[in-house]
């Protein structure tokens, strides 16, 4: 799912071990357009996306995927961010942020 959102927070996390070595990891808070009460989400970015931090306030097109899994009878949801493309100017999306 692609969304247009503003980066509210970017937290670089410690690198994680993968089958191919180490990879970067970041936790990103995104706020959708729609003003102060707009919906937001917290997702995890890995690899190249996590290795190129973007400034808070940057408006981006984000490729976000949601996964659910069950563990010990409880259902959990993971939000992964696969791509972040900064928009060149805020005028491209209007004044919704």
Task: Provide a role label for each language-model segment.
Residues 1-97:
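Single-stranded nucleic acid-binding surfaces, predominantly the OB-fold ssDNA-binding core
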